[in-house]
């Protein structure tokens, strides 16, 4: 009836996961009770859970990423403490628990922190920058988010029901095969990524279509903001790379469930095929994450330097070059597999070549800053911190792209430091910069600068104190994923890294405090102009937060920096006519399709993990029926009357006119 599921799945004999799970469960129940008692449930259902508004979906992606950051960050703290105290001892984490922690940490931070964060920012901002009212497929946008949330839920369920994979975040066979991982841990890993991967693929298709087909009048490709270009490149990579991940995990699941032997050498399979396939997805995944961050930094550096982005067309070419070359370097992750010097040399050279367009971007940002009137607001601090940090990560990346060096450093702590150098210094710094930069647009008030700068400095310094020692430990021969060690030379560096993690944690606490203080002081921090940073692209041409329809009139773009051009030439449509002619606007209707699909996907995923076959059938039929019902709906839109559009727009115009007049601009 319940397949493999019984009371032994609850870790009653393991106090750490049991207590952690109990705390999470109590917190969830407390939030649910508060929502119901305060009467917020109808509001949440109508305005958020069933919303297909790209802005709200973007915010929900970012909220999911923030929650999972706390979970993934907690795993990181536990690992750093374990390695600090595990010299000539077993530390406080048993090996099987430690292995689950580093596997969950990598999986969560890549798939459920970095991915949702950048997709959330893309959802929030790209339609506004393109001057359009929503993404191409609003309901599928909701489906994509809720499937991602389903994957995150399954990962967290493994904390208290069963176990997670002990294989590392890429689950290499034969360790991930039934012979070495007979439990449900790898199944939790694979099904959570399969379900969330479908959501990511849907989001990628949606954003590619939006950029290619829904630009406002006058916005040709070479007038798009750089963030739109990097969004296009990133989502093209999603569309091309995520089917590889889906197929690879499907073959692994067939090995585990039906006794296939795709990756079993002794039965005619080939374990190296898994390595090739997973990294054929895995290296483009790095650029799926970092390219949107590059776009964010382009927007931030240009805005806070008070200048147009230097070398715009070269930035476009560099972005698309990275998009293409990222598919040609995957083998540098396993030079030691024995492919031979010729193959290694080709992929090593390709890995060095991809640094060239990245270098072009760095120089263009520096030239943009040169001669500008730089304002070191919090988003700009994250941008400058990124440039310093990412250069170090890039240099160490070029080093491990040299096959002889990689033979010495492969699977060492040097590699761990390099990877975090790129992902934290590139992706997370970019996500934080974008969060600070576009927060006023999403919520109508700025974040507190004092707490923001404290968060930056603690995070920046904490990062270096945490990860620079790992480079040294790697060069001293320390391999990664060690639950304990006996080499005295490694211990001082593990102690320093643990101290650095404490500083990083203070940085996260400062970010939480920044949010709390900003919400408390939101009236004093209110943005009534819609343009708190003196921005250059179209998202700043509407109110903060924007109305549901984004723009009362489609903007007319006549240059690269569309809104800056409007401000410079006093051609804002807001000021062109005293009595513009408003029209009805058709908008997509809210839909529970995404939430219902996710509900049935959760049932099906959980049942597949525990081999509860009747529940698998129930979940599959429910998900399929939901899609059929959605497909046969005839009325998916509603109309906002012209009078209502006029009322909302005039309130915005009057407030902006009064503020502009007070500033002496008009």
From Swiss-Prot:
Residues noted as binding Cu cation in the record, renumbered to the chain: 283, 287, 332-333
Gene3D superfamilies in the cross-refs: Cytochrome c oxidase-like, subunit I domain
Entry's Gene Ontology cellular component terms: plasma membrane
Binding site for heme b 1; low-spin: 105, 420
Subcellular location: Cell membrane
Domain of life: Bacteria
Pathway: Energy metabolism; oxidative phosphorylation
Record flagged with keyword Lipid metabolism: no
NCBIfam families assigned: CyoB (TIGR02843)
Membrane topology of the entry: Multi-pass membrane protein
Keywords per UniProt: Cell membrane, Copper, Electron transport, Heme, Iron, Membrane, Metal-binding, Respiratory chain, Translocase, Transmembrane, Transmembrane helix, Transport
Ranges that cross the membrane: 16-36, 57-77, 108-128, 142-162, 192-212, 234-254, 277-297, 315-335, 346-366, 380-400, 413-433, 456-476, 493-513, 591-611, 612-632
Catalytic reaction equation(s): 4 Fe(II)-[cytochrome c] + O2 + 8 H(+)(in) = 4 Fe(III)-[cytochrome c] + 2 H2O + 4 H(+)(out)
Record protein name field: Probable cytochrome c oxidase subunit 1
Binding site for heme b 2; high-spin: 418
Entries under SUPFAM superfamilies matching the protein: Cytochrome c oxidase subunit I-like
GO molecular function, one term: cytochrome-c oxidase activity
EC number: 7.1.1.9
Organism per entry: Bradyrhizobium diazoefficiens (strain JCM 10833 / BCRC 13528 / IAM 13628 / NBRC 14792 / USDA 110)
Crosslink site: 1'-histidyl-3'-tyrosine (His-Tyr): 283-287
Organism classification: Bacteria, Pseudomonadati, Pseudomonadota, Alphaproteobacteria, Hyphomicrobiales
Main location: membrane
InterPro entries: Cyt_c_oxase-like_su1_dom (IPR023616), Cyt_c_oxase-like_su1_sf (IPR036927), Cyt_C_Oxase_1 (IPR000883), Cyt_c_Oxase_su1_BS (IPR023615), Cyt_c_ubiqinol_oxidase_su1 (IPR014207)
GO BP: aerobic respiration; electron transport coupled proton transport; oxidative phosphorylation; respiratory electron transport chain
Family, similarity comment: Belongs to the heme-copper respiratory oxidase family.
């Amino acid at each position: 009836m319940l397949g493999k599921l019984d009371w032994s799945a609850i870790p009653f004999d393991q106090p750490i996961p049991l207590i952690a799970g109990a705390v999470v469960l109590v917190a969830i129940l407390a939030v649910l009770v508060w929502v119901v008692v305060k009467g917020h449930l109808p509001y949440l259902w109508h305005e958020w859970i069933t919303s297909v508004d790209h802005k709200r979906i973007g915010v929900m992606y970012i909220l999911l990423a923030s929650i999972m950051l706390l979970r993934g960050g907690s795993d990181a703290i536990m690992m750093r403490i374990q390695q600090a105290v595990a010299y000539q001892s077993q530390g406080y984490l048993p090996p099987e628990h430690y292995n689950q922690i580093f596997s969950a940490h990598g999986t969560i931070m890549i798939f459920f922190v970095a991915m949702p964060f950048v997709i959330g920012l893309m959802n929030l901002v790209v339609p506004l920058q393109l001057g359009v009212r929503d993404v191409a497929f609003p309901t599928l946008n909701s489906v994509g988010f809720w499937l991602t949330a389903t994957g995150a839920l399954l990962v967290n369920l493994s904390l208290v029901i069963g176990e997670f994979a002990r294989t590392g975040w890429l689950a290499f066979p034969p360790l991930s095969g039934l012979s070495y991982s007979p439990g449900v841990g790898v199944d939790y890993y694979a099904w959570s990524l399969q379900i969330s991967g479908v959501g990511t693929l849907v989001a990628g298709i949606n954003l590619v279509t939006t950029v290619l087909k829904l630009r406002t009048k006058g916005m040709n490709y070479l007038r798009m903001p750089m963030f739109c270009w990097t969004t296009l490149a990133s989502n093209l990579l999603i569309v091309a790379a995520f089917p590889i991940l889906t197929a690879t995990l499907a073959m692994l699941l067939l090995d585990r469930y039906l006794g296939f032997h795709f990756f079993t050498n002794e039965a005619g399979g080939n374990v190296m095929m898994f390595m090739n396939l997973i990294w054929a997805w895995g290296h483009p995944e790095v650029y799926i994450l970092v390219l949107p961050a590059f776009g964010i930094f382009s927007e931030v550096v240009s805005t806070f330097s008070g200048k147009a982005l230097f070398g715009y067309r070269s930035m476009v070419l560099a972005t698309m070059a990275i998009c293409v070359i990222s598919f040609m370097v995957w083998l540098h992750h396993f030079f030691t597999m024995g492919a031979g010097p010729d193959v290694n040399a080709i992929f090593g050279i390709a890995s060095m070549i991809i640094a060239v367009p990245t270098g072009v971007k760095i120089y263009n940002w520096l030239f943009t800053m040169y001669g500008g009137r730089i304002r070191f607001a919090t988003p700009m601090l994250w941008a400058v911190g990124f440039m310093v940090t990412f250069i170090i990560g890039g240099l160490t990346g070029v080093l491990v792209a040299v096959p002889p060096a990689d033979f010495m450093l492969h699977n060492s702590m040097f590699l761990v430091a390099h990877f975090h150098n790129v992902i934290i210094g590139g992706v997370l710094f970019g996500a934080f910069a974008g969060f600070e930069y576009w927060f006023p647009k999403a919520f109508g008030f700025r974040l507190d600068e004092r707490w923001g700068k404290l968060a930056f400095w603690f995070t920046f310094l904490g990062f270096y104190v945490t990860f620079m020692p790992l480079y040294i430990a790697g060069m001293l021969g320390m391999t990664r994923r060690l639950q304990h060690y006996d080499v005295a030379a490694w211990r001082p560096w593990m102690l320093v890294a643990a101290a650095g993690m404490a500083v990083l944690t203070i940085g996260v606490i400062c970010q939480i405090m920044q949010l709390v203080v900003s919400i408390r002081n939101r009236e004093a921090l209110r943005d009534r102009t819609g343009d708190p940073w003196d921005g250059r692209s179209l998202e700043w041409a509407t109110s903060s937060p924007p109305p549901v329809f984004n723009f009362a009139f489609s903007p007319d773009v006549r240059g690269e920096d569309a809104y800056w051009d409007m401000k410079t030439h006093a051609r804002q449509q807001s000021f062109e006519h005293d009595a513009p002619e408003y029209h009805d606007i058709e908008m997509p209707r809210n839909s529970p399709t995404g939430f219902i699909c996710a509900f049935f996907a959760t049932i099906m995923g959980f049942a597949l993990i525990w081999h509860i076959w009747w529940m698998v059938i129930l979940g599959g039929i429910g998900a399929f029926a939901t899609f059929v019902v959605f497909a046969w709906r005839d009325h998916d839109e509603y109309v906002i009357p012209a009078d209502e559009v006029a009322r909302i727009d005039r309130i915005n115009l009057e407030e902006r006119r009064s503020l502009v007049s007070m500033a002496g601009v008009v």
